[in-house]
Amino acid sequence: MGNKINPNGFRLGVTKGWNSRWYAGKKQYASLLKEDEQIRQLINKKLAAAGIARIEIERAGQQVNVIISAAKPGVVIGKGGESIKELRGDIERLVSAGTVAVNVAEIPNPNISAPLVALRIAEQIERRFAFRRAMKQAAQRVMESGARGVKVILSGRLGGAEQARTEKVLEGRVPLHTLRADIDYGTALARTTYGILGIKVLVFNGEVIGGKTETFARPQRRDRDERRPEGGDRPARRRPTARRRTGGE
């Protein structure tokens, strides 16, 4: 089940939170859900160069709070705050009622953010990079940035082949069935001349214990000299003596 289900949905309420946090009745629920989807589409289209990793929407009464997690917050804010003011006006035209507040959060380490890694691979494939090279370089970059494991899945007409297939790159370990595992999940689409390729990235950052993500170092293997007891070399083994078997009368 861990290989099929969305890793974020599988861990909701355990180690992951909701991207939309509000409550509405039966009559308003559908319209507010549609507004959230329109807001996300607008932000992803308007701020594609900012490296958007996550968009959270909170509603309380007539107040709508949009939190944008981006690798380049300067692109979201713009010169003198012009871009964020324009974005706030566009969102207010989509929202049925209430005032809109837009906040920007910077991602401290974009190299271990799964959505950003997937977007980077998609950009390289669209610029005609070799897909295997792009996948391996992305996985190595994630591991060098301190992640415990990474899994990259690429599917579609790879290399312009007639038949679609799937290729995977795995570095470290990615425990999909462990609910306390802090796994970041992201997807992206690479639009090429021979079709659309789907990219999935899963990054394992450690295990969440007591509300904190803890990483455990792998035990290092000791050398042979360190494993020997103090006081000399290893005692020689006695070879078993061969017994001569004689037949009885």
Curated annotation (Swiss-Prot):
The keyword Ribonucleoprotein applies. One of its GO terms (cellular component) is cytosolic small ribosomal subunit. One of its GO terms (biological process) is translation. Residues 220-235 have a biased composition (Basic and acidic residues). InterPro entries: KH_dom-like_a/b, KH_dom_type_2, KH_sf_prok-type, Ribosomal_S3_C_sf, Ribosomal_uS3_bac-typ, Ribosomal_uS3_C, Ribosomal_uS3_CS. Residues 236-249 have a biased composition (Basic residues). Signal peptide: none annotated. Part of the 30S ribosomal subunit. Forms a tight complex with proteins S10 and S14. This is Small ribosomal subunit protein uS3. It comes from Deinococcus radiodurans (strain ATCC 13939 / DSM 20539 / JCM 16871 / CCUG 27074 / LMG 4051 / NBRC 15346 / NCIMB 9279 / VKM B-1422 / R1).
